[in-house]
């Protein structure tokens, strides 16, 4: 028979995800007794006891499921928090706040549209209301197609900016719907414009949400993260529906009160959206983040971590960078003669060709068929460094000398400066790339905007492929 010490000695342990482990020891009757059941927090599943047993008692590894752990399994991805990115929880909390505010604003807007269509008005024409509705919907459908064609490939590059833009545009659309009944003669045009904006919101918001889900999913669990996000949104919308049922009767007869509530809810919506987007920490480089990281590297010799760079990334002005950088342009945009091609290729050992227009501060890059992600990063870095030569701020020695040459001799051929910066990058870029990887950036992929053009040209035998 085992003595008391051996009975208390743990036979084995178990844990759920990153939750605290609990041990199992032998009970006096020879059964297994699991301890620590009551200490488990909401970040791990609560143990469930078998019928007739108490939590932590012998005979079963699980205690009764608590309410919080039940909500966790319903609303959060399996394996949370290890199965998602570190910014998942703050983003989802602020996203839920903005969804709640948007739900209430949407109720006010829907009420206004229904009033404008004649709901509750005996003199209203069913055919007129139907025609208005059809015009509104068809306008929105066209807008959805046009935006997907026009900006679809660019939504990944600036997902945070487009996400914020979409939600602000949604507020504008709801404002138009609330104002529409006040001007009956323009009602159809107003609600059609509003629905056009909402369809743009649907495309931009849905696409960027998918991009953010890819970022959040850390165990190839995109479907689970997306499904739980949908569940969270449904719960928030249900709460918004219940509050709307109480709010609408109070404001329905007072347009000014309705408009005042809308303004307050819109302010909350925009603030929560800003906080949600600002909470995101994306580890891939787009042009804005690359420029921030590169500037810091050139000035201080160290690479910003993703958390710091994301906090500094502009959210309102990210669509209009000071430098016009075009990657993957057709080769015929860069050269128009054999001499220009030879001039551009000479001394070019990387699988890209770069042309810099100093007067327009415009950089165009033609990529080789063999160009990989690191080549694109180097080309973008090259272009941003050329742009930095025309701006203020500290630079390393060789680049500071090149800037002095640019300022002293504005007529100096740009292709000469491109070649000289190539030589600087041969030393600088490997250090920069190593620093990016050490800081936590994912350099095997990027979110730089790159067109599909690729080219071949007479190559130096020293050409590199990254």
Curated annotation (Swiss-Prot):
Q: Does the keyword ATP-binding apply?
A: no
Q: Which domain of life is it from?
A: Eukaryota
Sequence positions bearing N-acetylalanine: 2
**Subcellular location, record wording:** Membrane
Could you list this entry's UniProt keywords, alphabetically sorted. Answer: Acetylation, Membrane, Transmembrane, Transmembrane helix
Q: Name one GO cellular component term.
A: membrane
- The portions of this protein that span the membrane are 245-265
Q: Where does this chain mainly localize?
A: membrane
State the InterPro entries in the record: RUS_fam (IPR006968), UVB_sens_C (IPR055412), UVB_sens_RUS_dom (IPR054549)
Topological type in the membrane: Single-pass membrane protein
Query: Into which family does the record put it?
Result: Belongs to the RUS1 family.
Protein name, as recorded: RUS family member 1
């Amino acid at each position: 028979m085992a003595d008391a010490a051996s009975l208390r000695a743990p036979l084995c342990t178990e844990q759920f995800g990153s939750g605290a482990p609990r041990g199992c020891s032998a009970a006096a009757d020879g059964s297994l007794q699991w301890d620590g059941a009551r200490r488990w927090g909401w970040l791990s599943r609560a143990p469930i006891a078998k019928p007739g047993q108490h939590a932590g008692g012998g005979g079963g590894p699980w205690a009764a499921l608590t309410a919080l752990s039940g909500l966790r399994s319903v609303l959060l991805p399996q394996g949370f928090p290890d199965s998602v990115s570190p910014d998942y929880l703050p983003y989802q909390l602020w996203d839920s706040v903005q969804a709640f505010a948007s739900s209430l604003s949407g109720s006010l807007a829907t009420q206004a549209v229904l009033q404008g269509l004649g709901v509750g008005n005996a003199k209203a024409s069913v055919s007129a209301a139907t025609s208005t509705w059809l015009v509104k919907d068809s306008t929105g459908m066209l807008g959805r197609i046009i935006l997907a064609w026009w900006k679809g490939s660019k939504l990944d590059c600036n997902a945070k900016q487009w996400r914020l833009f979409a939600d602000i545009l949604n507020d504008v659309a709801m404002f138009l719907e609330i104002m529409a009944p006040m001007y009956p003669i323009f009602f159809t045009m107003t609600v059609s414009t509003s629905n056009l904006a909402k369809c743009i919101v649907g495309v931009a918001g849905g696409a960027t949400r998918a991009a953010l889900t890819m970022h959040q999913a850390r165990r190839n669990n995109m479907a689970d993260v997306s499904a739980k996000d949908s569940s969270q949104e449904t719960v928030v919308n249900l709460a918004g529906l219940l509050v709307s049922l109480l709010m609408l009767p109070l404001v329905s007869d007072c347009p000014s009160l309705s408009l005042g509530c809308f303004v307050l809810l819109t302010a909350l919506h925009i603030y929560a959206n800003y906080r949600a987007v600002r909470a995101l920490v994306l580890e891939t480089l787009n042009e804005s983040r690359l420029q921030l990281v590169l500037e810091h590297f050139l000035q201080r010799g160290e690479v910003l971590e993703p958390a710091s760079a994301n906090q500094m990334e502009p959210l309102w002005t990210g669509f209009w960078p000071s430098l016009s950088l075009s990657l993957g342009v057709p080769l015929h945009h860069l050269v128009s003669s054999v001499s220009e091609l030879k001039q551009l290729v000479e001394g070019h050992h990387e699988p890209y060709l770069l042309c810099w227009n100093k007067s327009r501060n415009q950089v165009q890059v033609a990529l080789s068929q063999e160009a990989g992600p690191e080549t694109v990063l180097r080309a973008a870095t090259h272009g941003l460094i050329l742009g930095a030569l025309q701006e203020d701020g500290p630079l390393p020695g060789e680049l500071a000398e090149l800037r002095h040459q640019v300022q002293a001799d504005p007529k100096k051929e740009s292709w000469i400066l491109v070649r000289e910066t190539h030589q600087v990058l041969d030393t600088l870029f490997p250090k920069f790339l190593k620093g990016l990887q050490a800081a936590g950036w994912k350099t095997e992929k990027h979110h730089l905007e790159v067109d599909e053009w690729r080219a071949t040209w007479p190559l130096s035998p020293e050409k590199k492929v990254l």
